Amino acid sequence: MTATARLPGGTDDIATEPPPQPPPVQRSWARYAPWVVVALTVLWGLFELRPVLRAVPYLDDSSIHEQMVRFAAARIRSGHLPQTSWFPYLGLGSPQFLHYQSLPAILSGLAGTVVDPDTAFRWSLYLLLALWPVTIYWCGRLFGLSRWTAASAAAVSPFLVSVPGIGYETKAYVWVGYGVWTQLWASWTLPLAWGFTYRAVRSLRSAVWAVLFVALTAALHFETGYLAFAAVVVFPFLVPSDLWRRLGRAVLVGAAALLAAAWVIVPLLDQSHWAARNQILGGTPLENGYGARQILDWLFTGHLYDDGRFPIVTIFVFVGIAVCVARWRTFVAGRALVSIWAVTLLMTFGRTTFGALYRLLPGSSDIFIRRFEMGVHLSGILLAGVGLVFVAQAALDIARRLFWGESPDGRPAPTVSPSSRAAIAALCIVGLVVVLAPAWTNLDAYDTHNSVNVGLQAADDTQQATQLDQLLAYVRAHPRGRVYAGLPTNWGQDFVVGAVPVFKYLESKDIDEVGYTLRTASLMTDPEYYFDESNPGDYPLFGIGYLIAPEGLPSPVPAQRVACRGAYCLWKLPDPGYVHVYDTTGVLSATRADVGKSSLTLLDSPLLTRQRDLTVAFNGSAASAPTARSAAALHGRPGRVLVEHARLAQGQVRAVVTAHRRATVVLSASYDPGWRATVDGHPAPTVMVAPALVGVNVRPGVHTVTFGYGGYGSYVPLFVLALVVLVALGVATYFGWRRRVTAGISRPSRPS
């Protein structure tokens, strides 16, 4: 009989735990060597990612996430729910915390009531990214993988690099990257959602944890939530002989998770009528996915896991797949990993491959399908762990035959001493570091590049930011509405503080602005993209009172220069404020999918300079009647604002206006049914004014008009529902455990 070497502290199966047995006494530290691997990986991340903690304005989407944390902290301090509050800063405002995955910002905002919110944001980014290998190890153990397999997966987890750059990889999160911070939060819960779902379809003893982590994943990041529910659909079919019972458990887990996440899902669906679809990115691979041909090309050429380097992770992913397929009949966890890898790979192909068939996926018209790459990455990490241990085990078997040998009659070699086991474990760790050298050296170079750029930005802030801050201090002291500092599609992209465009820098200072486009689901986000800076009528429509432009660049419309500091000049416009009086002389038909392009003619027209606008027939509903039948019969302006007090961050605006004839008082804020209006203290119905603004009709005369945002009002019952579901499952699990104890079953078996 041939002797077979095993990894120290491992099991007889490289990837699965054997039935529970009394553990042998091990005097060697080899038993803890897998945890040493995880610890070394975490320590490496903590060291490499230190620049994340530097306070600089962000170049990527982290700017909006940090701003949401500040906003959440402020609303929580004042006793309000962020979900029912008006987020005013981008896209002419929106109920951002309802339409977007806002739980990470709320949790960080809670921390931000104790410490500085920006500090809370930076530390959350740093710790969630550096400590992520821990949750990968935990996930592997939930699937029943051996300690070494789970630790190997954890060691691989920080080192993925793909062409899209928005999967589970460093580039997705850091300063020179994309800043998909909410995805990072859900990257902690998705592995646990998969692991506990794998267990729950075998035994409901893990159901409460599966429900909790599936629901949390959906609340933290919508696209990741789809991947969490994908496991609920896939895992019942892993064991055909027990299919119906597994399906029943999966239905229970899925239904309970939907109920537990209803506080996010129900408001989102109920108010989706008022959330814009991104017309600019619609139909592109960013929304539709890159398609089977492109994804498979990246996969087989190494660019899905190892872009720009030797495909070391890709190799181990394919080895892991081969091992799992070879052991398909006995290795249930391997079936699970290969199955979820294949399903998420198919999901990543998107509408580019499947076309209208993708409509079967609920809500798919509002998600960016390319983000499903996360599922391919997570399952690939676990498969790479399987592949690494298989290769290591094969190498150890060869070494044992060479160095320990075996007797001529096939008897096993002598037992390996504890000191030898420790030496083998140490060699395995060193070997892992060497094997992954192409990955960690590549990432180290990228981290160095990121660190250098963060340092350069910090240096530029000391001079350039100080100059711009002087102008912003004037803006705050003399409020006149929003600030415009260019667009990503014109001179604004190259008008910078260090490397950060000024329109992004304004966001870091919580300056209400126009120009940082396509950041929210506001109905005005697409019309903002088509803002015509050469049309004087667009400025009051968008509530712009100030222009910040490069020194030497004249104002595109008549304006008065206030001051210049360094390369930055501040101009004030002649018709400032958030509230204006318009005649409405016709109807614009638009939907949430075309409101931007439908508004192009209006935004380019001279009508706005004469304070003429249109009402909107939105999503097939009837428009409010215009205040005038024809613009030709009108003479002069319809009225003006006498006094304005705007506190949009609190959802409150008050104005005193004079109307020369029946007219519409328009608030330059994105339309939402949560807005309420009063005229002279009496409630009045709001009207939708083109492109998608909120207004109220008034008669001739002087009037006091108020606008207040109330928000979605059904959160409390939904919070209670989530709590009841989780408590009920927890109680049922507890009493089930008590019954098993009473029956003499004190320890549950591990899943296969």
What spans do the regions from the language model cover?
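Extracytoplasmic
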Residues: 2-9, 14, 61, 75-79, ...
